[in-house]
Amino acid sequence: MAVALASQLREGTKKSHTMAENTGFVSCFLKGVVDKASYRTLVADLYFVYTAMEEEIGRLRATGHPVVGPVGFPELNRRETLEQDLAFYFGESWRSAISVTPAAQAYVARIHQVAAEAPELLVGHHYTRYIGDLSGGQILKNIAQKAMNLGEHDGLRFYEFGAIPDEKGFKINYRATLDNLPIDQAMADRIVEEANHAFHLNMRMFQELEGNLIAAIGKVLFGFLTRRQRAGSTEAVAA
C-alpha cells in the first residue's frame, strides 16, 4: 500500500529546515554576506557528499532497487557541475587542492553506511539535498553572484539544472514518484527521520564554516546578522 511520503517529508522536516536556515553561515548567506573562501570550502564539501550519494544511488539504480531506483533521476546529478565550480575556485589542479572536512566526512560516512545497511533511507538524503537545491537554487545563485561579484556562470554551475527545463513539472513528477514507492508506513517514518538527520549533517557543515566567515567579516557584524531567527522562508518551496 502506497503512503503519502512526499507530504510526510515536507511536513516532517519543516523544523529541521528552519533550524538549518538559522545557522550563522546560512543566515548570513541569505542576507547577502558570502565570503568566497568559506563558500569554496562549502563547494568542496558538497562535491564529496554528492560524489558519495550519486555513486551509491547510481549503483542501486543499476541493480533495480525498487525504492531507491525510481528516485535516482540522473538529470538531478550535481557532481559534474560541482567539478566545474571547483575548477573555477581552485584552478584546473583542484583535485589536489581540496580535502574533506570533518563534517563532510561524517556526512559521507553516513551515506555509505545507509547504502550498505538500509538503502531505502537514501531517499531521505536524496529529498533533502536535491529538491532543496532545485527549489531554492535560483535564489541562492542570485545571492551568491551578487555577493561575490561573479559572472553569470562563474563558480555557480551547481545551481543550474540544464537537464530540467520545467522545474515545476519535474517536482510534481518527483512527488508522485515518492508517493508510489513500495514502502509501508514504518519505512516512511524511518525515511522522514533520516531526512531530518540529513538536515543536521548539513548544519554541521555550515557550522564548521562559521569560523572562517567570522574571521572574514568580524564578530560584531556576524552577531548583528545572526541575532534574529528566521521563520523558515523556503520551507514551503520543497517538494
PLM segments and residue spans:
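Metal- and O2-centered redox machinery and metal/ROS homeostasis
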Residues: 1-239
